[in-house]
């Protein structure tokens, strides 16, 4: 895991956990291909510590996102990136619930 420092010397991280409900009729495997591409590109972003997308049971048609970012600004920038916009335009999912927390060490 990459380490990131705050000006004060401690580590600051922004955690996000989200449950996405699949609203598209597309096959789950096709949808997950899109999310794996998103995962690969997002993990290259400056400010992204880790980003993972995992499907729940196929019958549930839900995807979990686990994300750790340097700060909230990095998250905002993430939503301006082409790979993020491309997935959003497809209207594959909607947010069922989302939890955010900031941790400073």
From Swiss-Prot:
<protein>
    <recommendedName>
        <fullName>Uncharacterized protein YjcS</fullName>
    </recommendedName>
</protein>
<dbReference type="InterPro" id="IPR007138">
    <property type="entry name" value="ABM_dom"/>
</dbReference>
<dbReference type="Pfam" id="PF03992">
    <property type="entry name" value="ABM"/>
</dbReference>
<dbReference type="InterPro" id="IPR050744">
    <property type="entry name" value="AI-2_Isomerase_LsrG"/>
</dbReference>
<feature type="domain" description="ABM">
    <location>
        <begin position="14"/>
        <end position="104"/>
    </location>
</feature>
<dbReference type="InterPro" id="IPR011008">
    <property type="entry name" value="Dimeric_a/b-barrel"/>
</dbReference>
<dbReference type="GO" id="GO:0003824">
    <property type="term" value="F:catalytic activity"/>
</dbReference>
């Amino acid at each position: 895991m990459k380490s990131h420092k705050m000006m004060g010397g401690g580590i600051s991280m922004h955690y996000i956990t989200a449950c996405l409900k699949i609203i598209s009729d597309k096959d789950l495997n096709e949808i997950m291909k899109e999310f794996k591409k998103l995962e690969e590109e997002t993990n290259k972003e400056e400010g992204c510590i880790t980003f993972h997308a995992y499907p729940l049971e196929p019958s549930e048609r839900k995807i979990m996102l686990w994300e750790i970012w340097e700060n909230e600004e990095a998250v905002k920038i993430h939503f301006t990136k082409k790979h993020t916009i491309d997935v959003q335009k497809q209207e594959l999912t909607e947010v069922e619930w989302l939890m955010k927390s900031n941790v400073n060490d």
